A protein has these predicted regions:
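Single conserved hydrophobic/aromatic residue that forms the stacking wall/gate
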Residues: 1-13
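Alpha-helix initiation and N-capping motif
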Residues: 22-25, 115, 132, 177
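Structured secondary-structure scaffolds
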Residues: 20-23, 28-38
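Conserved helix-adjacent loop modules within structured domains
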Residues: 34-159, 182-184
Length: 184
């Protein structure tokens, strides 16, 4: 996932639990494996004491995981809720959805779960005035079938994933739009 150095540090801070020292990702994986029906499985990178060091506060800032089980199914299903305070729809929507969907697949795989729903809650989704013509152009373009996503099924340790373990096939795209102005 693309995160600033400060945000990466927030995810890697290790805290003491009765089970030992863990960062947020370690804690999520531990809980998914040991207490999957807990209502406390989440990450949060919106750390107020660090905000003064950031040019841009975290937009997508927390992920809550919810595990369900369908009647008659031996495997559990991992669902997630992504909370986001703000989103530049043109510049970030596809990126946010894809990165957190891949994260869900990775976590589900290493915890031997099925992938369920990803619910994306955006408090302020916006299209800037200068983006309106670009968005109109994109809406008018031909639509293509969704590409296929593959995750190396042999990886069972979250920290062993590399970019080589993720493949996108049958990806068809129109002409690239370049130089999209980004607001900070």
């Amino acid at each position: 996932l693309h995160l600033s150095i400060r945000r990466q540090r927030q995810m890697c801070i290790r805290d003491r639990y009765k089970e030992g020292m863990m960062d947020q990702v370690d804690r999520v994986i531990y809980d998914l494996k040991h207490t999957p029906f807990s209502r406390r499985i989440l990450t949060n990178i919106y750390v107020h004491q660090d905000l003064h060091e950031m040019n841009l506060y975290p937009c997508a800032y927390s992920m809550t995981f919810n595990v369900t089980q369908k009647k008659g199914d031996d495997r559990l299903t991992l669902n997630g809720i992504l909370n986001q305070r703000s989103q530049d729809v043109l510049a970030a929507n596809n990126w946010n959805v894809c990165q957190y969907a891949v994260l869900m697949h990775m976590l589900a795989q290493v915890c031997d779960m099925r992938v369920g729903e990803l619910v994306h809650v955006i408090a302020d989704a916006h299209i800037y005035d200068r983006h309106v013509p670009i968005v109109k152009e994109l809406i008018e373009r031909p639509q293509y079938d969704a590409p296929k996503f593959w995750l190396n099924p042999d990886i069972k340790d979250f920290y062993q994933f590399t970019t080589d373990d993720i493949k996108i096939t049958d990806y068809v795209t129109g002409e690239q739009i370049k130089d999209i102005p980004i607001a900070v």
